[in-house]
Amino acid sequence: IASVNCSDYPKPVCSLLYMPLCGSDNKTYGNKCNFCNAVADSNGTLTLSHFGKC
């Protein structure tokens, strides 16, 4: 199962680096920072589906 370490997040500003991740909400996040901030916003209910676009 794919996983991402989000212990350093949320961060106030994310880089523009594009390395897409697909969340359990079937939404593509542009990079780990954007994904981890969304995980924080979801109180941990959002998980990683897989690396790459959904």
UniProtKB/Swiss-Prot annotation:
PROSITE patterns: KAZAL_1, KAZAL_2. It comes from Geococcyx californianus (Greater roadrunner). Residues 4-54 form the Kazal-like domain. This is Ovomucoid. The keyword Repeat applies. GO terms for cellular component: extracellular region. SUPFAM superfamilies: Kazal-type serine protease inhibitors. The record marks 16-17 as: Reactive bond 3. It is found in: Secreted. Avian ovomucoid consists of three homologous, tandem Kazal family inhibitory domains.
